Each structure stands twice: as C-alpha cells, then as structure tokens.
Amino acid sequence: NPVDGVEITYKLASGGSATLAITHPNGDVIREISVPGGSGVHRVNWDLRHSTGSGSETWAAWDNPELARPIGNRGAWVTPGVYTATVSANGSSNSTHFTVRGDPEMPQITQDMYDARERFMLEAQALTAEIQAYMRENGMGGGGGRGFGRGGGPPIDTPQGKLTAAMRAVGGAYSSLNGGQVRGGTLYPPTTTHRQQFHLAKSLFDEVRGGMDR
C-alpha cells in the first residue's frame, strides 16, 4: 500500500528521543509526534491530519495487509497550503517544507471551502473537548471518544442528559464529515444541517452551564 500522507526521511548521528512537529500555514504547530530516535536513517509519515486532541502521540509503521490505513479515531484533514515538518533530536532541529494540495479529482472544492471545513472541524473538536471536561469536573463521566455513540442514555431533561445529547449532536456532525472505521468522510464544507447540529450542541451546553452556575 502507498504511504498514508507525506513521507519524511531523517538521519540521526546518535541515539536519543526525537520529535516530529508539523506547522500549519498559519504558524500554529498542529501535531507533535514522538518518532524513532536511534542512530541512522529513519522514514516516517504524517497523515495530513490534525491531532485528535487525545494526548501524546507516538509514530508507528502501519503494515496491516488487509487495511490500507488505520481505521481508529483520527483527526480532521488539514486544508491545502504549505506546511513545515521539523524533526528535533539531540538538541538540534531540521525542517523541510512541503505543499498539501486539494483533491485533483474534486476541482469544484475551492480553497475557501477547504478552509471552512477545517475551521468547522476544529471548532467541533474543541466544543466536544470542552463538554467532556465539564462533565468530568461535575461527576457526569465524559471520558472516552467524542460522543459518537448511539443508544440509550440519561433523561434529556437532566443536565447529564442534555450534555449527552450535545455530545451526540456535535459528534454526529464531526463524524459524518471525517468518516470513521471503514466509512469514508467528505472534503466538502459543512452543510446547514451540520451547522445546526453544532449550534444545538452549543445551546444545550450553554443551557446546562447557565443553570448549574447559578
């Protein structure tokens, strides 16, 4: 299978820890990944995605003959632009620049559309993390995943029920764009329905916070 994303090759004179940092065109570092730090030549890849926001990352080669790429939880696709990959090890750093392009088979998607999609995905991810943190702080669970699950839950007229519904709403919007498991996502920007799901989640969250903070 071809490499997932862009391949990065580096050589280290001596062993130690090493980190790969990816810098967005806007100057923000969007991924920091622990990579092999032994002496010699190494080749790793970045999957052209943002972090999942779930903690530290360690790179590992993907060699499943039945699957072209991982099917677990993954961050949102980045928007087209010029990115910087920096490998830091043994007190020194080396950077290289590369261009991420839009899908050539979808020329109808403009840069503004890619940018709108990226903004929405990051806002959805941030809202989910905020709701999860609030639930944990107030003894309502909130750990694990993005609330993408379906099924039963606490009554909707309770704070926990409203937050669970909020997680499902924003999680549904995120996953329908990003895909998951073996289901592909889409590069198109969010629809009116996606934005309505996001605003519903935010309204429910604001309602719970307002009631509990009084």
PLM regions with names:
Residues 1-19, 23, 43-45, 110-129:
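Contiguous beta-strand segments within globular domains
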Residues 29-76:
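Glycine-centered tight-turn motifs at strand-turn-strand junctions
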Residues 52-56, 88-96:
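Short acidic/polar inter-strand loop motif in beta-rich domains
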Residues 98, 129-214:
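Mature extracytoplasmic or organellar-lumen-exposed domains after removal of signal/transit peptides
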